[in-house]
Regions:
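Conserved short alpha-helical segments that host acidic/polar catalytic motifs at enzyme active sites
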Residues: 1-249, 261-294, 333, 428, ...
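Hydrophobic alpha-helical scaffolding
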Residues: 7-10, 99, 119, 134-138, ...
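Glycine-rich oxoanion-binding loops at beta->alpha junctions
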Residues: 66, 70-83, 274-287, 311-347, ...
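Acidic/histidine-rich
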Residues: 152-186, 463-489, 526, 531
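Generic C-terminus detector
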Residues: 226, 252, 543, 556-558, ...
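Active-site phosphate/pyrophosphate-binding segments
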Residues: 259-263, 267-297, 377, 387-516, ...
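Glycine-rich phosphate-binding loops that contact phosphosugars or nucleotide phosphates
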Residues: 291-433, 437-440, 522-566, 584, ...
Length: 609
């Protein structure tokens, strides 16, 4: 969620702070601010609204100095306002901080500090931290920050600056991401790689409980007791251009069109010509390992949860193992049966989703073996899990996930085949056929993307409806959920997905004349059943848009429009049928004039509970 940047070096800090924050806009925010030490005092500028408002506010009097911090805020404590925006300062302007997370014991701390004479200007939990720093400071900046960390409770990424110590920034984290970019005669701090990738690819990934002292020519990392921590440099492999729009109007459209390459890269080096068709060298599983589990949980949030629903189908059908899928925020609190015979698979594009990370930690505590599927190397979830497999989708900037989702499906399918081969629950010839179908996916996605005009037409025709329903059975139902989520999150149309067989159990009451129903009918084993459900909504004068495989001539008899996707095996169809749904959501949002990449009230990475 909130974006954090920091700079110490010889160049003007404000230039980097504003540019870095612009690269973090995808995380979602409602206000922005920077603080720069000008040689005498800490100059703070902040504004509610978009970053452009802050730029306009400081036009002609940009704070000058080579030490600074910046922040884009997502309101949790206190409404969006100039005074609640970060950075926050203490009573005398000696310190400034930026923060992502939640300080859980801020109220008791605030009462104590107020009783000692501290005056608070904002409604935020963050301001308590900077006043606490002022209270405990006695000349040693590092010791004071360490004392603050002993007193606060919660999740956080924090960056501290002091006009009394203008050669350094201090930063620390607990359950929220923070990285340090290593430059030449300058160093950077950020909550995510896009903020610094144009300046350096060499980074330290800060661990929970670690405190870094960042100067222009050095970085020292210690634990909370002050003991030195040795850090390994992580080299970012993608470049700044990968995080740019590349000529597309929006990041989301670019990322939709990135999918053939993203899928190809995710499959790369995992398809072999050896005895086993699928290889995950990073896992090294065998039959004894897989047979040691009596249950598998897939735990995720949002789009990743929808990918998990497809993953459940793949694993159960191919590897013949019982799988449960849970929303991470629910899994954490229902006291699930987790022990040493449990395999927990967590899915997160960013690798920083707070509820998913918490579920992972709790399951490990109970003895489960854990596997992470994520898109970000070195992320918190990747580091916490026992094992990790990556979707090589490249940076995904738009809030609405597209290429991360399709690569998650591809990875789940390959993982299921890998498990099935080990357990010998699939015939070699069937594996070979499925691998052939798998390798066709990139070109089939390209085929769908080559003709989007019919989808644009549907978006214009139905983009101003207030309700849209999605129906499907089996794998089609899982994809329906993702299609509805895409439409609602970027076009703000009320969209809901239902298992087609559940229509009679209440949903039919919502079907009235002219309401659009998007019906997925790609699964042959439930095809006739789905047709009967389509007839039910047509009988109530719904406008039905069908999703079917090329060559399906039956469906068009019962629907108003058809969007065709290339024909393939039932396992592959979810990866293909979601593409027109992504495009439909995108063009509906364009039709309605919505901010596609940064929809209201949403953030890319949900790093607070």
């Amino acid at each position: 969620m909130c974006g954090i940047v920091g700079y110490v070096g010889d160049r003007q800090a404000a230039e980097f702070l504003l540019d870095g924050l612009s690269k973090l806009e995808y995380r979602g925010y409602d206000s922005a601010g920077i603080a720069v030490y000008d040689g005498e005092k800490i100059c703070v500028e902040k504004s509610v609204g978009r970053l452009a408002a802050l730029r306009e506010q400081i036009k002609g009097h940009v704070p000058m100095g080579t030490l600074g911090i910046g922040h884009t805020r997502w309101a949790t404590h206190g409404r969006p306002s100039d005074v609640n925006a970060h950075p926050h300062t203490d009573c005398h302007g000696d310190f400034a901080i930026v923060h992502n997370g939640i300080i859980e014991n801020y109220l008791s701390l605030k009462e104590d500090l107020a009783a000692k004479g501290h005056v608070f200007k904002s409604e935020t939990d963050t301001e308590v931290v900077v006043h606490l720093l002022e209270e405990v400071y006695s000349g040693d900046f590092i010791a004071a920050v360490r004392e603050v960390l002993h007193r606060i409770e919660g999740s956080y990424a924090l960056v501290f600056m002091s006009r009394r110590h203008p050669d350094m920034l201090l930063c620390t984290k607990q359950d929220n991401p923070l990285i340090i970019g290593l430059g030449e005669g300058e160093n950077f701090i950020a909550s995510d790689i896009p903020a610094i990738i144009a300046r350096t690819r060499r980074t330290y990934i800060l661990g929970d409980g670690e405190l870094a002292v960042v100067r222009k020519d050095s970085v020292e990392v210690m634990d909370r007791s002050g003991a030195p921590v040795s850090k390994k440099i992580f080299e970012v492999t993608w470049n700044a251009e990968a995080a740019e729009k590349g000529g597309y109007e929006h990041f989301m459209l670019k990322e939709i069109h990135d999918q053939p390459k993203a899928v190809r890269d995710t499959m790369s080096q995992r398809i072999t010509s050896g005895k086993k068709a699928i290889s995950f060298e990073e896992l090294g599983w065998d039959a004894a390992y897989l047979n040691s589990f009596n249950k598998i949980y897939i735990v995720a949030c949002g789009t990743a949860y929808h990918a998990g629903l497809v993953g459940k189908y793949y694993i159960e059908k191919l590897a013949r193992v019982l799988v449960e899928v849970d929303v991470a925020s629910e899994f954490r609190y229902r006291d699930p049966i987790v022990d040493e015979k449990t395999l927990l698979i967590v899915v997160s594009q960013s690798g920083e989703t707070s509820d998913t990370l918490a579920a992972l930690k709790e399951s490990k505590r109970r003895g489960a073996k854990t596997l992470a599927i994520t898109n970000v190397v070195g992320s918190s979830i990747a580091r916490e899990a026992d094992q990790v497999v990556y979707t090589w989708a490249g940076p995904e900037i738009a809030v609405a996930s597209t290429k991360a989702y399709t690569t998650q499906l591809v990875l789940f399918f390959m993982l299921s085949l890998y498990m099935a081969e080990i357990k010998e629950t699939i015939a070699p010839e069937h594996t070979a056929e499925l691998v052939t179908r798998l390798q066709e996916i990139p070109s089939q996605i390209s085929e769908i993307l080559s003709d989007v005009d019919p989808i644009k037409t549907f978006a214009k025709q139905y983009g101003f409806n207030e309700d849209v329903f999605y129906i499907g059975r089996g794998l089609d139902y899982a994809v329906s959920l993702e299609g509805a989520l895409k439409l609602k999150e970027i076009s703000y149309i009320h969209a809901e997905a239902y298992a087609a067989g559940e229509l009679k159990h209440g949903t039919l009451a919502l079907i009235v004349e002219g309401v659009p129903v998007i019906a997925l009918a790609t699964q042959r084993n439930v095809y006739e059943k789905t047709l009967s459900n389509i007839k039910e909504v047509k009988a109530r004068d719904a406008v039905v848009i069908g999703i079917a495989a090329v060559g399906d001539t039956e469906l068009q008899k019962y629907v108003d429009h058809v969007m065709h996707v290339p024909a393939s095996d039932e396992f592959i169809m979810p990866i293909l049928s979601v593409i027109p749904l992504q495009l439909l959501a995108y063009y509906a949002a364009i039709t309605r004039g919505c901010d596609v990449d940064k929809p209201r009230n949403l953030a890319k990475s949900v790093t607070v509970e």
